[in-house]
Amino acid sequence: MLIVQQFQKRSFIIPSLISSGLSYLSKDIRLADKMEDGELHFPKTEFEKSQNTSRPLFQRPEPNYPGHVPLYNFEKLLMFLGSSIGAFVNPTNNNFIVSLGESTAFPWVLNRLRTQMLNDPSGRQILKERPHMTSKSLNLDELKNYPDNSLGKSYFLWLEREGVSPDTRVPVKYITDPELAFVFQRYRECHDFYHTITGLPIVREGEIALKLFEFMNLGIPMTGLGALFAPIPIKSSQRRRLLSVYYPWAVKNGTICKPLINVYWEKIMKKDIDVLRSELGIEKPPDMRELRKKARSKKKQVA
Amino acid sequence: MFQVIRRFATSVSNVADIVIIGGGPAGLTLGTALKNSPVTKHLKIHLVEGGKIIEPLNSFLETPPPNYLNRVVSLTPSTIGFLDSIGAWSHFNQERTQSYDDIVTYDGVSGARMNFEHPDIATMVETTNIQAGLLSRLNELNSQQEVKLVIQEDTKVTSIAKDSITQWPTLKLSNGDSLTCRLLVGCDGYNSPVRHFAGIESRGWSYNRWGVVATFKFADTEFRFPTGWQRFLPTGPLALLPLPNGYTSMVWSTTPELAEMLLSLDETEFLSMVNAGTRLSTEELSMIYDLAKSKSPDLLEQIQWRLNLFAGKLKPADEENFPLQVSEIVTGSRARFPLKLSHADTYVEDRVALVGDAAHTTHPLAGQGLNMGQEDVKSLVGALERATSRGLDIGNSLALEPYFSERWPQNHVLLGVMDKIHKIYSTDFAPLVAARSFGVDVLNSLGPIKDFMVGRISGNSKR
Amino acid sequence: MIRHSRNLIKLQSVRYASTKGKENSATENLRLGYLSDAQNAYMDRVIRVDQAGELGANFIYNGQYLALSHKRPDLKPILKHMWEQEIHHHNTFNNLQVERRVRPSLLTPLWKVGAMGLGIATGLMGKEAAMACTEAVETVIGGHYNQQLRVLTNQFHVDVVNEETGVNTPTVPEEIKDMQKLVSQFRDEELEHLDTAVEHDAHGARPYWLLTEAIKLTCRGAIWTAERV
């Protein structure tokens, strides 16, 4: 009886459950696991000592090409969220568009583009040679002497009219595979040529129309997002013009024309631009700057 | 003079206990096993083969050809155990066999891989080596026994009919003889005349695929343990199986157009194509196929470009996930054969039994076709032994039926499984690819289940 | 505080073991290192799990003896012999646990009940089932002891610095060598039990594969848990 009274009533189940659950985190268990796996105190051979296999737990993977910044998936998601909001609110800041483009350029999209390039002889040549467009590689000084109505001359005139230069393209940083990064870089660099061949200016309205054209032709998600959301904050008269004139044009031409990613622009600079347009299957849309000037003068008249 | 008399006399029918039609691995194994077994060795057995086999097979063992032949099969440990038990394995040219411990199968679209490791999981042996070893053992048994197995080579069977009185199968041979037997065993391949004679239906379908075979030598860049590789492309699996001394036998099951294209390439292009097939993505491969079909002159350059790009992206640790590149081809080893699935409705009829390809044909993706035939032989010999020791008429369905009931369901399951694997891997539809890759990844990490699969395939499972 | 005193005890035992039977001139100038935290943690784990394991084996044989002794008195000697060896193993590890002040497995009551239950159940299923159970358990234990032996042999070096020359020659201390011998001997005895069980128709059990694989799985799970809890 006395012994029974001396026996203390203690809770047993809950504390032992907790301690057995938490014990997994205990240092002893982790150390003993490491011993079992042969990671500690194991005499290393000379070869193994020369291998530096120990890595800290969270280490960024190696860059695959110069300028590559490997991102984790959650970082890419954050970049997408930030850049999509930023591009909507402030589309003139190039960084947002660039980041939005790279964070939405999923591997399967770029893979599809690369397959398109692989199946075309000129596309294959571009993939093999990996040309980069700079003002030097395009020989801007010679372009002004090219025949009128050639692609080179039109490009030069367009550059002058809009006041831009081919050297301002931001290099691709966040795409993992080097070949797919090149494909995206090529798209960025050819963007000015798409302007030239369609004649669209670099005003907001022009960029939006060109985005839809690119989306129908290339399928890059950023262009689709741009075409969908960018017309929301612009002036209603511009939006009306966009939706009635340029969007139908973009849909029609983007779908039926040949994949523009395969065009080796640098090699066809001397070609007549109208011939090129008919070969590719593009009709020139109404000149946007003219339409805008007319609309402005009409408003002035009315006022 | 003897012959003149014979010509004018009514042809005397030879009578045998068992006539085996077909001198391929199945027929020779059956003959050897029957002669080896103390229960059945007294039976009078004739083996009829349409081609000349004795001289070529004997010379194969005496003066082996310098190059490995392109018909090579993968033998399971169970088959080798059986061949050993009938005393034939020791007669094989062992230096020309290659046993390997590792099989790697990987998905052509997603790269999901499965690794099977087991000591001596399979052994590669040339078909001629098998036949030669069996023939050698048969000659040895014949020299030791009174009742000899008669091999009639270069003799075609012109007709098979039922004898009017006894109902026993009677064959008319191309050399004028006629042969009556108690039991007729058809080991005569897919278009088995014996099966047609017995009126047995064989059901199945053509896979609309051709197996392209060739023998290569791996590039001598690094040491690898002999491994069997199989890449499941959407058009069909590409398998590289190890042979001795760094050689490898390739079986590429692919569509008829691609098979024709592969055979039309010259040797260097073919080598590059095979290297591309083991490494490059399906989009790159379809670009390469289109270039090859249109006979583009820069095919080699384009393949080399993509291979170099691939090699540049490959991390050193991942190099062992792909087979070595092939650098030489054994000239004249390129060939192709059509792939089809077929399964006979029954393996036994009154006084008729079917073994091997006459009973079933399958896709080579798991290397089971010949092994199934060997298991058939083992089972049939067991049934005949039991029948003989009980004094039964061996041609009677009662004696033969245990063979059918033992083998048919097992063969059917195996044929079905291989058919499903072929179908699952014949697509590059993204959701299916994701599902099968997930399944493969899960299965690859479940050791016990893989061991079970290996045990079933190699016939080693504990009963 | 407790860790410090434990290390002291370990250090003393290391030093004591090292000077056992060695010549004085050699040992006077040697400074022996401590076993590291990881090595101590692993030793604790070894003793804990082996104590629990031998307790389990003890109770399994106990249960089998109980279940089979009435129906199969011819098996009594062989079961008794194996049981007694397990009792000896269990006692050895009990002593080691107390000596080194290792926490025993918290789930010991569970192991007692489980092992007894397994012994009785397989005993009631018959001789072949009991032998198959023994075979399964001893197979797992054989592999388990082998793994421990591997670690004890390869990874239990301590720094032994010669005070004069300053040269460090990592050596395995004597007590660890004794531990290796113990584990090796016990492993051999367990494998002997396995052979005995196979001799006595373990493969005749029905359902063989299911029974052995289920018992192996349970044993592995129990070993994993006893190592940690």
Swiss-Prot record, chain A:
The gene is COQ4. It is an enzyme of class 4 (lyase). It holds the Pfam family Coq4. This is Ubiquinone biosynthesis protein COQ4, mitochondrial. Lyase that catalyzes the C1-decarboxylation of 4-hydroxy-3-methoxy-5-(all-trans-polyprenyl)benzoic acid into 2-methoxy-6-(all-trans-polyprenyl)phenol during ubiquinone biosynthesis. It comes from the Eukaryota. It catalyses: a 4-hydroxy-3-methoxy-5-(all-trans-polyprenyl)benzoate + H(+) = a 2-methoxy-6-(all-trans-polyprenyl)phenol + CO2. Pathway: Cofactor biosynthesis; ubiquinone biosynthesis. It comes from Komagataella phaffii (strain GS115 / ATCC 20864) (Yeast). GO terms for biological process: ubiquinone biosynthetic process. Its EC number is 4.1.1.130. Keywords: Lyase, Membrane, Metal-binding, Mitochondrion, Mitochondrion inner membrane, Ubiquinone biosynthesis, Zinc.
